[in-house]
Structures are given as C-alpha cells and as structure tokens.
C-alpha cells in the first residue's frame, strides 16, 4: 500500500445523503472536513494576517501557482525556506496548478500537447507552462497539497473538443506524476474534467483513479453553468472517486453550493468569493447578504449578523463599518473580509455537526430559508 503524505480518515457518513465527516492529515497538521479553504492568491489572504486566519478557524489555505511563479518567483520562495516560512503560516497549504488562470487568458493562450503558451498579464511577455513546469514550481513552493496541470474547458464547449481535452489532461497528469520530486512530503491530486458530459467525466475519473493519486479534485465547475447543472455533474462524478481519499471541488464558495457539494460527498472547497465581495461592502449573514454601503445602515448600530460571534460582529456596528468603507479606509475591508471568511468556515463547522447528527437535509432547508434563497434570485 502506498504511503501517501496526505491521508484521509473517514469518521462518519450521514445517513440520508452522501455527506462525509472526516479529517485530512498533512505534513503541516490535520484539518477537519468538510472544510472551506480561504484563498491567498499572492501568498496572503487579502487584508488578513496568519493570526487572524487561525482565529477564524481556517485549517488550510490556498495559494496560486501561476501568480507566485510570476511574482516573486518560485525559486526565490524556495530559497526563503518554502511557502510556509515565506508567509509565516505553519498549517497546511494547497496550491493550484495554474491551469485555471491560463484558461482564463483565453484570448492570449495557445494549447498544445507539450503545454500552454500565453502572455504574462503583468508585462505582456511570452510564457510557457507545461505539466512538468507546474509540478516543479509547486515543488519549489513546498505546499502540502499540489494540483496536476490540467485544461479547464468551458462548460458548454462541444463534445469532441472536451473529449480531446480530457484525454490530454490525463496524459498531462501522468507526466506530472513522473516529474514530481517530493512525493514523500507533498501530495499531488488529479483533477477530473469533462464539462457536463457524464461519459467524459467517467473516462476522466477512471484514467486518474488508475494513476493512484492521494486525492482527487473536481474541476470545470463554477464556470458559468447553472446551480442545477453543477449538482447534476457532482451526482455522477463523486461516486466515481475512491472513498478512502479526499475529494476537492474547485472554485466553489456560495453557501448553497457548499452545502449541496457536501451532500454529494465533497470534502474540500475554495473560492475568492468571501473576500472579493467583502471589498465591495457585501457581507454574508445568517439572514442573507447585506450591502453595508447602503444608506439605510448609516445609523444602524447593530452587528453585521446578530447570530455571529466573530471578532467583527462582537466589536463593531454596521454604521461604523459603513463609515469606514465609504471613507475608503482599509480597516473596513479587513472587518468585512474577516466576517465573510468566518461565516463560511463556521458554516462548514455547522455542516460537520449536522452530519454527526444525521440531519443535514433539515439543516440545509432551515439555512436556505433564513438566508433567502430562491431559484430566481440566488443571493451569495
């Protein structure tokens, strides 16, 4: 049996759904699952210190291979002692492969069997990223969990294109495994693609499971498809993945999508959503989203969320936070970002308890009713 640096321990499966309560053991510690991972694109979660992230309960954070490769450079980070030391974070780190960022540069990239040529978004220079290079960068960064280099096809691309894409992604995954220099202390995940086509998702999953990765990611979702389409893909994809290994749904952070992903057997999630909307003054609360810059909050001296015990809600009012944001004070963004991150991390804590109590479906219904979801208006 392979001795992986990343191990998944299943504690309990919820009686009425596919939801899993577990934990993931890494070289830099263990974190409970299901878990939402804050995104620290540039080796920092925007406006938050490592101490604040620990107070929030973030057991693991994500950093971005593409951005750190361009600036300050993976070799510089390696010389500093690795990403953990560079950013003063002693808990687990996951790095993506850079594939999604390259995918997002659709107008300036060229995909071949060897890899992807694209324009550096900082200075316009030509860059080349291959499966081997993506692994080399992540080996230099020293993250606990790494991603294979993949192509993320658009959800509605033609069948023939997606078929060729997943076959290439499988070949890239095999090349990445061979290039991996640190399998003893860095766990490499394979990424299942296939857009909305069930047979292609099956083919992609079968290819990757045969390669025996320590964990598996589900990619190519949250890229413009409907919530119902995402759930349908998860319904037929997660059962294809090994029960004894972690399952990671990439780029998902809306509360209803998190809960629905957990119901379908997903263990890990990440998204820039909580910090991105916080910078615009949008806050997640137990009763729905709150746009704090609105004039009606100018003299509202209550917390952002009456049911939240985070640092922001325990110490500051809506009126004060609105004032900070209207005055372009960074502290306002820090407070809203802290609250939104806490909200999602704490939501996952409540979800874990609901799995333990075998009442996740009831929890989902109660949460969504309070939050104000309906099909015509999916608030964050």
From Swiss-Prot:
UniProt: Zn(2+) binding residues: 308, 310, 313, 339
Binding positions for substrate per the UniProt entry: 96-100, 150, 193, 220
Co-factor note (free text): Binds 1 zinc ion per subunit.
EC number, as in UniProt: 2.4.2.29
GO cellular component terms given for this protein: cytosol
Transmembrane helix in keyword set: no
Region (RNA binding): 251-257, 275-279
Family of the protein in this entry: Belongs to the queuine tRNA-ribosyltransferase family.
Classification via PANTHER family: QUEUINE TRNA-RIBOSYLTRANSFERASE (PTHR46499:SF1)
Complex formation: Homodimer. Within each dimer, one monomer is responsible for RNA recognition and catalysis, while the other monomer binds to the replacement base PreQ1.
Name recorded for this polypeptide: Queuine tRNA-ribosyltransferase
Source species: Streptococcus pyogenes serotype M5 (strain Manfredo)
